UniProtKB/Swiss-Prot annotation:
Molecular function, one GO term: toxin activity
Name assigned to this protein: Snake venom serine protease homolog rhinocerase 3
Cellular compartment(s): Secreted
Peptidase S1 domain mapped to chain residues: 24-250
UniProt cross-references to PROSITE patterns, sorted A to Z: TRYPSIN_DOM
Any Pfam family hit: Trypsin
């Protein structure tokens, strides 16, 4: 029965891809002006980026809890890692906020980290914030993913520039069918391309999922290898955490994370 259900979903996805010019099979280099809110995270000793994140305002960045690391450095306004933009900035964290310890999140719950920068950044040609969502995401939405993650699945190939692609938002049950052990309910989103070939991948964790123009998800977990058929990725549902995020930013000491 499960195989038949997944096969029907695959046929629906193939039909959708044929009808919608917005869907792509493989990612391409992002336009340099498309991602002023996208940030790159790495350690001072690392030569490659560890994760991505999203600038919410001049002081705050939102990413995944799994992206926590020592000696974190945050790059803003970055496009080509080999040719820095003139307005590119580097910052370090002043504060880190978690729903739970960065060591006890799960792939289906509370994989979220809010970072306050030690020094604010001003808007620029390649630096600008992305607002929190005003509405919850809708199943069937076309969503945009982006990051400096691996662009190949059989071996790790990191690009110098971020790649962007469109994927589709599915009902959470699709990911439950694909990955055994997921709970019946979760504050995560399920998104991808059911025929495979496009997905978030290594180092894209923490980056944004933008659906119908709204920041709806944080890259959390994908199948291994990436971009396999019938294996969508999981994204932390940003809308479910907006009260917590806004409370932390407003310095509300009584705000609590969703149970």
């Amino acid at each position: 029965v499960l195989i038949r259900v997944l096969a029907n979903l695959l046929l629906l996805q193939l039909s959708y891809a044929q009808e919608s010019s917005e869907l792509v099979i493989g990612g391409d280099e992002c336009d340099i002006n498309e991602h002023p809110f996208l940030v790159a995270l790495h350690t001072a000793r690392s030569k490659r980026f560890h994760c991505a994140g999203t600038l919410l305002n001049k002081e705050w960045v939102l990413t995944a809890a799994r992206c926590d690391m020592e000696n974190m450095q945050i790059y803003l306004g970055l496009h080509n890692i080999s040719r820095p933009n003139q307005d590119q900035k580097r910052r370090v964290p002043k504060e880190k906020h978690f729903c739970v310890s960065s060591k006890t999140y799960t792939r289906w719950d509370k994989d979220i980290m809010l970072i306050r920068l030690k020094r604010p950044v001003n808007d620029g040609t390649h630096i600008a914030p992305l607002s929190l969502p005003s509405n919850p995401p809708s199943v069937g939405s076309v969503c945009r993913i982006m990051g400096w993650g691996s662009i190949t699945t059989t071996k790790v190939t990191y690009p110098d520039v971020p790649h962007c692609a469109n994927i589709k938002l599915f009902d959470y049950s699709v990911c439950r069918d694909a990955y055994k052990g997921l709970p019946e309910k979760s504050r995560t989103l399920c998104a991808g391309i059911l025929e495979g070939g496009i997905d978030s991948c290594k180092v894209d964790n923490g980056g944004p999922l933008i659906c119908n123009g709204q920041f709806q998800g944080i890259g959390s977990w994908e199948g291994h290898p990436c971009a396999q058929p019938l294996k969508p990725a999981l994204y932390t549902n940003v809308f479910e955490y907006t009260d917590w995020i806004e409370g932390i930013i407003a310095r509300n000491t009584t705000v609590t994370c969703p149970p």
